[in-house]
Curated annotation (Swiss-Prot):
Pfam families: DnaJ (PF00226), DnaJ_C (PF01556), DnaJ_CXXCXGXG (PF00684). The keyword Endoplasmic reticulum does not apply. Keywords: Chaperone, Cytoplasm, DNA replication, Metal-binding, Repeat, Stress response, Zinc, Zinc-finger. Zn(2+) 2 binds at residues 161, 164, 187, 190. It is found in: Cytoplasm. The keyword Lipid metabolism does not apply. This is Chaperone protein DnaJ. A zinc finger (CR-type) spans 132-213. CXXCXGXG motif repeats lie at residues 145-152, 161-168, 187-194, 201-208. The lineage of its organism: Archaea, Methanobacteriati, Thermoplasmatota, Thermoplasmata, Thermoplasmatales. The gene is dnaJ. Residues 4-69 form the J domain.
Length: 357
């Protein structure tokens, strides 16, 4: 007994092609095996729906079915997935049903999205970071061709790619039935753009870009630290009329004897032991700056004395960190007779005194 394909799709015999396609898409959403994992009944129903659509969506097959009530499927060995010619419709259903580009992802899709941004690592000194600076940076990039405005076309006229018909992708199908694996690759003709130049640009030869050497000045903000990224818009590579950005990634190099922690700076400073005991005042230099630091009496080795607000400027412009001075005490290796005499006197006096340092 011949199958009633119209009843299977739920349409009348005078249904238009749009009505038939709409009915198929709705039923395919409902019964597709990937939406009903492990459901054999849904799997058979989906196969039946696909068979009905294969016949009714083809004018010649539909005419034969309407006139005789039979098709090659009825007379032969039955419907086979190798006979199905509408896998694009099923892929469209995946995209609508699951959202976005699910079909491409599910079937092993690939979309060419070139990374147009350029990242350059630039070394600067801690002094440059302290005061701010301007650095010259040289690099090479693929810039937009000004002759064709990045279109790749001599007359800026683009036509639909004849290979991918504007999709920018080519599909390679492997396997059978709804277990087919569809691999989506970049179109080899238009390189994913979907369009090609009507006549290639005489300057860039159809690529839309030209290689360009850049020599730019980059402003280093006060307080910059390692791994800070400075973004320069539209100074990256170009592709398809779109230009990426240039990111300058800073590496701040500390000079010997100076350490940075956040916005605080640590330096070592050596004093003699009489000053450590009696106290005094020392001049502390940092780059082009000079500070007077009071040394309290009884200062110990390794003690940290703080100069408020003399550290790295905060990059947001609100204040600065601190300059932390790590005290080292120098013990002389060679003494004069008088110095030895005074120290012996000091030691003896200390033994007699109740006060101990």
């Amino acid at each position: 007994m011949a199958k009633d394909y119209y009843a299977i799709l739920g349409v009348d015999r005078n249904a238009s092609q749009d009505d038939i396609k709409k009915a198929f898409r709705e039923l395919a959403k409902k019964y597709h095996p990937d939406a009903n994992p492990g459901n054999k009944e849904a799997e058979e129903k989906f196969k039946e729906i696909a068979e009905a659509y294969e016949v009714l969506s083809d004018p010649q097959k539909r005419k034969q079915y309407d006139e005789t009530g039979t098709t090659d499927f009825n007379a032969g060995s039955g419907f086979n997935w190798q006979d199905f010619t509408h896998f694009d419709d099923i892929n469209d259903i995946f995209n609508q049903f699951f959202g976005g580009n699910f079909g491409d992802t599910f079937f092993g899709g690939y979309t060419n999205q070139p990374d147009l941004d350029i990242y350059l690592r630039v070394n600067i000194s801690l002094e440059d970071a302290y005061y701010g600076a301007s650095k010259n940076v040289k690099y090479r990039r693929n810039a937009m061709c000004e002759h064709c405005s990045g279109t790749g076309a001599e007359n800026k006229v683009l036509i639909t790619c004849p290979t991918c018909h504007g999709s920018g992708q080519e599909r390679i199908t492997r396997g059978q039935g709804f277990f087919r694996m569809v691999t989506v690759t970049e179109c080899r003709t238009c390189h994913g753009r979907g369009k090609i130049p009507q006549k290639p640009c005489t300057v860039c030869h159809g690529t839309g870009t030209v290689s360009k050497n850049e020599d730019i000045s980059v402003n280093i903000p006060k307080g910059a630290d390692t791994n800070l990224k400075l973004r320069l818009k539209n100074m990256g590579n170009s592709y398809g009329g779109v230009t990426g950005d240039l990111y300058i990634v800073l590496i701040v190099n500390n000079p010997p004897g100076i350490r940075r922690s956040g916005q605080d700076i640590y330096v070592e400073h050596t004093i003699d032991f009489p000053e450590a005991a009696l106290g005094g005042e020392e001049e502390i230099k940092l780059f082009r700056e000079s500070y007077n630091l009071k040394i309290p009496a009884g200062t110990q080795p390794g003690e940290i004395l703080k100069i408020k607000g003399a550290g790295m400027p905060r990059i947001n412009g609100h204040g600065s960190g601190d300059l932390n001075v790590i005290i080292k005490i120098e013990v002389p290796k060679h003494l004069t007779s008088r110095q030895k005499e005074l120290l012996e006197e000091f030691r003896n006096e200390k033994k007699k005194s109740w006060f101990h340092f």
